[in-house]
UniProtKB/Swiss-Prot annotation:
The gene is rox3. It comes from Neurospora crassa (strain ATCC 24698 / 74-OR23-1A / CBS 708.71 / DSM 1257 / FGSC 987). Residues 1-28, 330-341 have a biased composition (Low complexity). The keyword Acyltransferase does not apply. Keywords: Activator, Nucleus, Transcription, Transcription regulation. GO terms for cellular component: mediator complex. This is Mediator of RNA polymerase II transcription subunit 19.
Amino acid sequence: MSFHPQTPQSPSHFSPSSSDQSTSMSGSIVSTTTTLPTPAHSVNGSSLANDMSFTDIVMGENSPQKRKRTSDDVGDREQKKVHIEDRKLGIDDLHLDVGEKYLLCRSQHQPPRPHLSEDLFEMYGLADLAAEYARIKDGQKNALRKTYKGHIKKLGVQGHFDSVKTDEKDPERLEYLMGCPQEEWNAHFVRGKEITRGLSSDMKSKISRAVTMSRGAVPSTLWNNSVLGDIAASSMKAHLNQPPSARPTAPNTPLAYGGPAMQRVKPQTPGFQDNRPRRNIKKRGYGDSSFEGYGEGFEDDGGLETGYSTGEGDMASGLKRRKKAQPGTQSYAQARQQSSYGHHGVSGI
């Protein structure tokens, strides 16, 4: 019996129990019963049928690698989605009890009212009015089939409501204008009637100046106060000249009292002189007479040994008398005035 070299992926032709260890070659690999069959795509030059038959030969009836369950037996595993959705769904599947629906019918929706299947005339009390104007096939001609003239007369509405029948081919009718071809419409209503043709040459020369906006003063002759909603001066004067009783007032407004205390004070004329008392005191000045009264005070107590004039010493019993000015002496104010004018003031001393 010849032996062929085998790869690790190739199955063995002989079992280790039946082969002789002494006769095996050193380069051969001993296979066991747990060796997996070689896949069909990894064997070059072999067909799928030969591989399947070879697998059946290697795996016996008692091999642990053989599948003992049928193809329909899935065991404890659940069916996949592709196996469930193979069948087509019908109307009966909508009524299957699948438990509580998630987030379904959480809010209550009120049916809209009124429902179109109800009698609206009976619901709103319009049955009598509908019976009056309903068209019933009783062989009689309804007077209101073309116009509501009789009903309008019954209501007492003033005016004429006679319908005027017009010709269907009248070019002034809206239906004729809508069905007019585009070429005919342009020839009759567009061409030669552009809006720019309605403006004269004089108007075209002024329109650019009229629509140009720029800053500037408006002449008084062209100014109109009514544009801004202001009260004109003439109407304001007429309003002021009216007596208070003739002026319109708001409701619940108390009337003005026409007593002497409420009379309006008229503005004084420029030549009018008021008899109010005026101030006679002159303003402060710096002339020769502005220093009067500065030297008419008490003398200083610096040279006295009896104390101050506030009550200490022998002079505490009374106030000092004002010292009378002697003819041969000169007052302090005059001496100060003469000494403040330079050498011209002291030249006479």
